[in-house]
């Protein structure tokens, strides 16, 4: 249970594929919720039915809450829901903490943190990894940037949504770490797609190949979680291609800022471009293999 009445009330902004299950995990942990989403999705009503209070705006969602969590799509969205005319900054009380769990620009994160600090409001950037399954099960990895004391105070909130929770450094460090994560994730996805496509093109039993290689040194989260979905033709999104592309764009921008070449991430970015061009932007990132299937004229599926 939360230690104080102040921290027991949480404003949650953004109830999409990730945000809704994350919010739902806070309720059984003893927190009360005020929730807001920019569109009236069915998931909003699901959270309200579970005990959340519907807010009329980000400002309203933040009002009276000791913690405000944002989980939206992109950098401009975070700027709008926190700093916009009806943003959370206009409703949140001094001494409260805003936790942005979106994946956005580290530069904008630092700007938002500075604006909130002027109002006496703390900020943590706490992007996540683990996909929709991790969000549903409360097992997300959470990469945090901010002050140690603020992190310690908010740790019980984060523990209701995740398991592997690390404070990396000051504001922006969480976002930079998430970009490092997205490099590793996207390149692992690319490697898995190439391996499965070679097996299919060579007329192998792709299921047997996946079973064989995922149990050894080639094993990865992608092999375990996305490989079986590919073989069953399941491309429903846990994390959409278009969102992976948004993150890879941030990776490329960050690399450019420090004059660093990232050929693996760049190649993954280009192959996801092919997937998007074929009309699969709203599918899960396992749809990366469709770029290879188009090239080979053959699908990688279980027989």
Please place each PLM-identified region on the residue numbering.
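Rossmann-fold dinucleotide-binding core
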Residues: 10, 104-182, 186
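Rossmann-like NAD(P)(H) cofactor-binding subdomain of soluble oxidoreductases
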Residues: 58-63, 67, 75-140
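Small-residue-rich helix-loop
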Residues: 204-216
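Interdomain hinge/lid region at the active-site interface
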Residues: 171, 175, 219-286, 303
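Hydrophobic beta-strand scaffold residues
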Residues: 33, 54, 122-124, 165, ...
């Amino acid at each position: 249970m939360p230690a104080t009445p102040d921290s027991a009330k949480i404003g949650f902004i953004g109830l999409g594929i990730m945000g809704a299950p994350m919010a739902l995990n806070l309720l059984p942990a003893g927190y009360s919720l005020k929730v807001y989403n920019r569109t009236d999705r069915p998931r909003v009503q699901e959270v309200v039915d579970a005990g959340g209070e519907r807010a009329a705006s980000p400002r309203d969602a933040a009002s009276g809450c000791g913690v405000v969590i944002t989980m939206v799509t992109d950098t401009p969205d975070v700027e709008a829901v926190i700093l916009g005319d009806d943003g959370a900054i206009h409703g949140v009380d001094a001494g409260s903490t805003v936790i942005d769990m979106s994946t956005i620009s580290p530069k904008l994160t630092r700007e938002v943190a500075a604006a909130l600090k002027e109002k006496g409001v703390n900020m943590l950037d706490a992007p996540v990894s683990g996909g929709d399954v991790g969000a549903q099960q409360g097992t997300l990895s959470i990469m945090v940037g901010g002050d140690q004391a603020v992190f310690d105070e908010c740790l019980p909130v984060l523990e209701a949504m995740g398991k592997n929770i690390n404070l990396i450094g000051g504001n922006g460090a969480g976002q930079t770490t998430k970009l490092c994560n997205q490099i590793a994730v996207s390149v692992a996805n690319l490697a898995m797609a190439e391996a499965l496509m070679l097996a299919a093109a060579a007329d192998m039993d792709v299921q047997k190949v996946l079973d064989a290689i995922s149990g050894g040194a080639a094993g990865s989260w992608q092999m375990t979680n996305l490989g079986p979905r590919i073989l069953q033709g399941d491309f429903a999104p846990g994390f959409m291609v278009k969102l992976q592309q948004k993150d890879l764009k941030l990776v490329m921008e960050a690399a450019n800022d420090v004059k660093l070449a990232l050929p693996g991430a760049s190649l993954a970015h280009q192959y996801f471009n092919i997937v998007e061009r074929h009309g699969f932007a709203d599918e899960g990132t396992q749809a990366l293999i469709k770029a290879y299937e188009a090239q080979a004229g053959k699908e990688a599926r279980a027989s």
